[in-house]
């Protein structure tokens, strides 16, 4: 029977592979020959009628005769792409600034930004024209938003102060009659620009300095007009002795050159031929050969300093000539000459009607600058403004766009209301729209120049749909606003996310992503393409879309290549479908300036691919596609991206990338999983192995689609087999070593590829380990022969490691020939669990290991113990053999590994005793563990025990002996005392202990002590003072309040002195009860951390004894007492005499004296 091992590939995050999983070797590039579209953006679109996908390319049109949209498809040759213009696109008259191209299952929307002049007016505007196409690219609706207010609900009020509109208004026919809206056909009838001819008086009556001021005035006027009037052209005619054209309308189109010519004009002087100069303009300026257009509005500005002089023509004749019809004339008179009625009447004759609006008079040339704003207001007056505030004139409707349901579109109006911006919710069915901008809560000063509507996106939430709009210049940092379409009194965008860096253009690109493809938006990507560190590298913020009104939460950020600056990463973004076939949406992000400046003609720009997974988007890209790897001559590659549809019909999602001059389509490569199996014959390695082991290695393709089958036929599989990879000395090896290393096999078709090879034993087969499995690792990769191929080559999954592990077991002397079941019992005990550093010398652990089951192979014991335990000795049995290595540091512990009964531990017991010395140094932790771990090569036979140790540190601290102090209260009622406490000892391990000094300050109800000062000798000693009702360990009689001093000490010695003032003058009654005052000293510490070795010396006392003397009695008392005493003495003597006391005694004494004399005489006689 064969033993078959199957393995699944391990999930892992690897470094990006260059070709996962878009095929850069085969790309469709739009042709660069004349007439091909110069790309602004590109889009993949599918026609639902035939399910065919085409490439739509938007180009910058120079005029109305060139198409703005092209449809491209694969031509007859499979590697070429052919493009045809798409009809029906609205192309108004004007200068085209850009094209917005979006699409979905409802159709395709093309919006062109147009720079033109308003109908029958000098006012210029920057607006949009949009065409909505059906899914098969037929025209569905179109609108030219030249007069945006005409498209709005007439009941919708827009407040130009706070830039928000209120909801309400009329419906039905009332709406249709609101304002007249112009069609593109009507646009053809409008005039072609504005032509302004300046007629400058250069006669001799003008001083050169004044003439220079006139030239400066003309230069300033032209600059201001160029900024306000998009299609204004100028001509300048000077008159005097001669009449000459300084520059005409055609030459003024070069703005810088024409401004330079103004300053280089030389004054011609002499006569004042004003009428002839005006006729010269009619004959030589407002003609086609000089750049004049037939339908252009024509303006003549005459600047003069007085009467006409020396002119052969009559002014009235010139004014009434047919050529003057339709020319708007402004007359500016400079100087005092116009105080004369005739001269002023002549000036008014030059001007058009009404004379008051077209005639200007100043006293001198220095005052001309004051006319600029008034003249500009008359010539290029911006209708619909409040002051200088613009409303819809520069709205650029359609700058961004989204197609909604029910014939509605959402259009960005980035330039509305002084570029505060907004959006137009427009219905193509009834031609009406609602203007949406920021909430009234926003400060009107901060919303100006926000560019709201620069980008738009639609978020699909569980409770409905909401719209988000980017405002990249909001408060200079950028912001994202959201509009929730619900039944509310007001529809307005509310700020939801703010940018973090000034100038980063945060919010300029928005990309909603439905990761799991369930129809609900999961993430919103917000780009800041100008985010700068060293240059404008760019950054993309990934926000999780909240439910209902919750806040957007930042998941993470994405960035391009860290070593490249000015890449503008995030300039374009798109969700491109499931290009790696894992059922999660992927995202493409463009960095169009990456690699810019590498060399003349070199391609630059990149696109990064970020794959989705169940939790969102991966932080790192799976592929970076550089322009140089796709085709030569690609510039700004990555300025637009789109995808998610199958372009070439292979069933896989493809993407399109726009560059400056062409669009590129890249096809996806099929992603395949390989299931690797390995079969051994025999299925286990015998104990005594002689011969060969037959091995069959098979790779099976596990792919959900058939797209990989054609490409597999041209693939090669390169695999390597490594035998016994976990051992330094191999026990088996391939018989043919070349057959196991970098084997290249062609995949000839089908889903299987199998290979046979032989394993043979080495000389070291059973020298040490004949029991543990032999591990065999197989690594593999696909290779191609290179070149372009009709079918995309498959690729392995980027997120799965291309390797497999197999185990070849040895036969075992057990019931199961492959696995032995050992039963390991482990018991331990330790000599003591509480260790005192500085006191404890040794600690011993006894270890008992018993195997009561089958054989245990390669049994190992690992001892993990703290570093302050130094290994001393080990006591081990003779049999089975125990061999231990020297301890080695691993992280914060020491590890000692021991081999127990190698190679086989039979049914037996092992008793081991390990002794450590406790290091006399500070141990930082309160506790530590000694862990014993038993392991072997068997399956499921792990044993472990842990013993916890508790550590304390020893110290010696001795307080000075008790002492006595005296206070003579009879001499002085108060005294100054200093109480000295000396601490000395040995503190090797930095133990922290507290010295508490207790000074009684209130006895009974009398305040007798006041502490004046506290001193110490060590800087690191910290002392605190407080008044407490109790102090010390034992109570003291009569004391009601204490002054407590607590000092935290870590040194070997310390002297603490407390100075106090003792006052007992007013407490005579207290002194009768109290004869002494105790001052206490006591050492305390945390007994769970430290061990004090001499507790008997941790207390002391200083006793203050009060000395008292008897008081001297007064003189009357002494005299009275003396007299009384004498009288008592006299009475006593009289009583004794009366009783014969003195008489009897005298007689007895005489008798005794006579007797002694008689005896003495007798004694002498005898001698």
UniProtKB/Swiss-Prot annotation:
Placement of FG-GAP repeats on the sequence: 27-81, 84-142, 383-435, 438-491, 492-552, 555-619, 623-683
The cysteines covalently paired via disulfide bonds are 72-83, 130-164, 698-754, 814-820, 884-898, 998-1023, 1031-1047
Q: Which residues lie on this side of the membrane: Extracellular?
A: 20-1114
Question: Ranges for the VWFA domain?
Answer: 193-382
According to its UniProt record, where is this protein located? Answer: Membrane
Q: Which GO terms describe its molecular function?
A: metal ion binding
Leader sequence range is 1-19
Task: Give the motif span (GFFKR motif).
Answer: 1140-1144
**Does the keyword Magnesium feature in the UniProt annotation?**
yes
| Subunit comment | Heterodimer of an alpha and a beta subunit. The alpha subunit is composed of a heavy and a light chains linked by a disulfide bond. Alpha-E associates with beta-7.
Q: What is known of its domains?
A: The integrin I-domain (insert) is a VWFA domain. Integrins with I-domains do not undergo protease cleavage.
Q: Which family does it belong to?
A: Belongs to the integrin alpha chain family.
Query: Can you say what this protein is called?
Result: Integrin alpha-E
Q: Which species is this UniProt entry from? A: Mus musculus (Mouse)
Primary gene name? Itgae
